[in-house]
Amino acid sequence: STPSNSSAASDVYKRQIMRRYMMKIAEHFANEGGSLALITGESIGQVASQTIHNLAITNEVCNMPVFRPCIGMDKQEIVDIAEKIGTFETSIQPFEDCCTIFVAKHPVTKGNLKRIKKSEEHLEDVIDDLMKEAIDSTEIIHVK
C-alpha cells in the first residue's frame, strides 16, 4: 500500500530522503574542492535503494554529473576493488551506518518523487542545521 499522509510517506521513504541529503552534502564538498562530478560505488540492484528508478530520484537533487563505475559489477568485484584501494577494512567495521538504521521492513524499490519532496518540505526547518553539522563534522579520506 502507498502511504497516504506525509508522516507515513516520510517513514517509508526515510532511506531515499537520507540518500538525497547525502548527495547534497557530497556535492557541497565536490564544489568546495573544484570537482566537476561525483563518483559513487553504487551497483544496480544490489539493494532496494539502488534500482534505476531510485538512483534517478537520488540524482534529482544533484546539479553535477554522478558517475557510478561499479554500476554493473557484482558484490565480489566491488570487494576486490575496495581491497585494492584500501577501503575494504573500513567498510566492514561493525558500526551501524545510516543504511542499517533506516532499513525499512519492506524497502521501496520505486520511490515516488512527489511524495519524497513533500516529506522533505516538512524537514526544512531542521535540515539546514543538520546539514551544517554533518558538513562541519565530516572526515575527508583521500583514496589513491
Predicted segments, located by residue:
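Short catalytic/ligand-gating loop segments at beta-alpha or beta-beta junctions
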Residues: 41-42, 93-95
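Active-site adenylate/phosphate-handling loop in enzymes that bind or generate adenylated species
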Residues: 15-85, 130-143
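Flexible C-terminal active-site loop/helix
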Residues: 109-141
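Single conserved hydrophobic/aromatic residue that forms the stacking wall/gate
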Residues: 1-9, 13
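A generic structural signal for well-ordered coil/turn residues at beta-strand boundaries
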Residues: 34, 95-98
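Short acidic, glycine/serine/threonine-rich loops at helix termini
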Residues: 10, 49-52, 113
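A charged, well-structured terminal subsegment
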Residues: 98-113
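A short alpha-helix-loop-beta-strand transition element characteristic
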Residues: 86-94
